Design a protein with these regions (language model features):
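Intrinsically disordered, low-complexity sequence elements enriched in Ser/Thr/Gly/Pro
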Residues: 1-2, 36
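Sec-dependent N-terminal signal peptides of Gram-positive bacterial secreted proteins and lipoproteins
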Residues: 2-21
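Bacterial extracytoplasmic/cell-wall-associated proteins, especially those involved in peptidoglycan
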Residues: 25-155
Length: 155
C-alpha cells in the first residue's frame, strides 16, 4: 500500500513537472514573441523619429538641442490626450508636419538625427510633457523655450 502511494506521488510529480515545463516553454516562447514585436516597434519608431528630426531640424546650422526638442515634441504628443497614441499617427496627422507633404521626410537622415532619435527613444523626452508644439511662431498657451528660430510651446 505504501509502495503504491509512493509510486502515485512520484507519477503525480512527474506529470506536474512535465506540465510545469510545458507552461514554462510556452511562456518563454510568448516572451520571445513580445520581445521581437518590441524590437520591430523600436526599429519602426527609430526610422520615423530620425526622419522627422532630420526633416525638421537636420540642417548643419541646427543645434543638437533643437534636434532633441523636435523629437521630444513628437514623443510628448504621443503621451498627450489631444494627439494620436502612436509616433506614426502623430507624425502623419493631417496638417501637423510640413515635411510630410513637402517630401523632406523621405530624405535619408543624417547620423546626428539617428543618434539623437536613439537617445530619445531610450531615454525619453527632454522637455516637460505639456510641450507639444514647435514652430517659428508661438502657439498654444505659451512659449516654454526658444531655440534658434523655433518656439517650443505648451498645450
Amino acid at each position: 500500500m505504501a509502495r503504491r502511494l509512493i509510486l502515485m506521488l512520484v507519477l503525480c510529480c512527474m506529470v506536474s513537472n512535465t506540465t510545469y515545463a510545458s507552461e514554462q516553454l510556452a511562456m518563454n516562447e510568448k516572451q520571445k514573441g513580445i520581445e521581437k514585436l518590441q524590437e520591430i516597434e523600436y526599429e519602426k519608431d527609430l526610422y520615423l523619429l530620425s526622419h522627422l528630426i532630420n526633416a525638421e531640424a537636420g540642417s548643419d546650422w541646427c543645434s543638437d538641442d533643437l534636434m532633441r526638442y523636435v523629437g521630444s515634441v513628437a514623443l510628448n504628443r504621443v503621451q498627450h490626450q489631444a494627439f494620436p497614441d502612436s509616433l506614426e499617427e502623430v507624425i502623419y496627422q493631417s496638417g501637423q508636419y510640413a515635411c510630410i507633404w513637402d517630401g523632406n521626410f523621405d530624405k535619408e537622415p543624417c547620423e546626428r538625427a539617428v543618434r539623437i532619435a536613439k537617445e530619445l527613444l531610450e531615454g525619453g523626452s527632454v522637455l516637460p510633457v505639456d510641450v507639444v508644439f514647435q514652430a517659428e511662431f508661438i502657439q498654444g498657451s505659451g512659449c516654454y523655450i526658444q531655440e534658434q528660430n523655433t518656439y517650443l510651446c505648451t498645450y
